[in-house]
Amino acid sequence: MSMTDPIADLLVRIKNAAAVGKPTVKLPSSKIKVAIAQVLKDEGYITDLRVTATENNKSELEIVLKYFEGRPVIETLKRFSRSGLRQYRGKTELPKVLGGLGIAIISTSKGIMTDAQAREAGVGGEVLCFVA
C-alpha cells in the first residue's frame, strides 16, 4: 500500500487511538516517525516507544500513549506542513503554540526538534506539526 503522507498517518493514528482510550498504537516504522515519537516522549506527551522487527525486513513502531485522570495528555495534534504545501520558517519566524503551552515539531538541518530547541540552536526549518 502506498502512503503519500506518513507523518499525517502517524498523527492521525495517535489522535484516533487517544480518542477511544487505547493504551498503544502500532504502525509501520520509519526514521522520521521514530524521531517525531522521540520528541513526543521527551516532551512528556507519550509514555514510551518501541521499534520491533517484523517479517520481510520491516520494522514496527509501537507508541504507548499517556493519560492523566482518564483523559489523553495530547489534546491537539495537527499537521501543519503537508506534502502539497510545505511550510518553512526561519529561526525568527518559528511559531509558538498556545503561547508556549504546546510545541511545534520542526524538521531542521540538525534533526527533528521542538520549536524551543530550534530557537535555542538558531536554526529554522519545516514546521511539521503542532502538539498541545
Swiss-Prot record:
The answer on whether this UniProt entry bears the keyword rRNA-binding reads yes
Q: Name one GO biological process term.
A: translation
Q: Name one GO molecular function term.
A: rRNA binding
What InterPro entries does the database record attribute to this sequence?
A: Ribosomal_uS8, Ribosomal_uS8_CS, Ribosomal_uS8_sf
Name the UniProt key words of this record, in alphabetical order. Answer: Ribonucleoprotein, Ribosomal protein, RNA-binding, rRNA-binding
Pfam families annotated for this entry?
A: Ribosomal_S8
Listed under GO cellular component are: ribonucleoprotein complex; ribosome
Q: What does this protein do?
A: One of the primary rRNA binding proteins, it binds directly to 16S rRNA central domain where it helps coordinate assembly of the platform of the 30S subunit.
Query: Quaternary structure?
Result: Part of the 30S ribosomal subunit. Contacts proteins S5 and S12.
Which family is annotated?
Answer: Belongs to the universal ribosomal protein uS8 family.
Under the heading NCBIfam families, the entry gives: PRK00136.1 (NF001109)
Question: Can you say what this protein is called?
Answer: Small ribosomal subunit protein uS8
Q: Which organism is it from?
A: Xanthomonas oryzae pv. oryzae (strain KACC10331 / KXO85)
